[in-house]
Amino acid sequence: MVKSEINNNGGEPVFAVLTQYLKDFSFENPSAPRSLRPREKAPQIDININVNANPIGDDNYDVVLSLSVKANDNNETLFHVELIYGGVFHIKDIPQEHIMPLVFIECPRLLFPFARQIISDATQNGGFPPLWIDPIDFAALFQKRVAEEQKNSQTQPS
């Protein structure tokens, strides 16, 4: 393959993390200290994940990973964690068709271990065992997002 076919401008492809940041964080332990007693079974853990991205300036993207984690035992909320963790990525000289997968798959994949650690530390500091969230398939989330966008564009009147 000729190098000019790999990228648009003839420059070397660039993918770099410029910064990472904690945008918003909340840990609620509404039933403490009652919620900290030993339990016979593991609580129900509900995890919601969302990825958003916006271009900011030339070749830079702000990618935000939002996580909401709730632990419930019967009707009692044990804890609720909300985290918005972001990063600014510099993406240059990469073919246009690869930008969105890079932004919505690879960028959150790089952010996730840091967000996971924050949630683990918060649950442990809240008096619970550390919660280690399983790895997330960001490719599947991206495919689902694309399918929903296509479905919505087909159902909207012209």
UniProtKB/Swiss-Prot annotation:
Q: Which GO terms describe its cellular component?
A: cytoplasm
Is Chaperone a UniProt keyword of this protein? yes
- Pfam families hit by this protein: SecB
- Entry's localization field: Cytoplasm
Source species, domain of life: Bacteria
Q: Which SUPFAM superfamilies match?
A: SecB-like (SSF54611)
Its Gene Ontology biological processes? Answer: protein folding; protein tetramerization; protein transport
The principal localisation class reads cytoplasm
Signal sequence bounds: none
> InterPro entries given for it?
SecB, SecB-like_sf
Q: Which family does it belong to?
A: Belongs to the SecB family.
The UniProt function text for this chain reads: One of the proteins required for the normal export of preproteins out of the cell cytoplasm. It is a molecular chaperone that binds to a subset of precursor proteins, maintaining them in a translocation-competent state. It also specifically binds to its receptor SecA.
Q: Which NCBIfam families match?
A: PRK05751.1-3, secB
What PANTHER family is this protein classified in?
A: PROTEIN-EXPORT PROTEIN SECB, PTHR36918
Return the protein name: Protein-export protein SecB
Give the encoding gene's name: secB
